């Protein structure tokens, strides 16, 4: 399920990158799923 979650997160990040107008959302996603 980790792989599935990662794929979903990657898709979300890609979408945010396309319309990088909500850094807050990106910050929340990073906090919820720290890649570090």
Curated annotation (Swiss-Prot):
Record carries keyword Mitochondrion: no
InterPro entries reported in the protein's UniProt record: Crust_neurhormone_H (IPR005558)
Transmembrane helix among keywords: no
Domain of life: Eukaryota
One function term, GO molecular function aspect: hormone activity
UniProt keywords, alphabetically: Hormone, Neuropeptide
GO BP term, example: neuropeptide signaling pathway
Region Disordered, annotated ranges: 17-36
Endpoints of the signal sequence: none
Function: Neuropeptide H is the precursor molecule for neuropeptides C, D, E, F and I, which arise by incomplete proteolysis of neuropeptide H.
Record protein name field: Neuropeptide H
Origin species: Cardisoma carnifex (Blue land crab)
């Amino acid at each position: 399920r980790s792989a599935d979650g990662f794929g979903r997160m990657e898709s979300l990040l890609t979408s945010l990158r396309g319309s990088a107008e909500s850094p807050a959302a990106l910050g929340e996603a990073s906090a919820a799923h720290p890649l570090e």
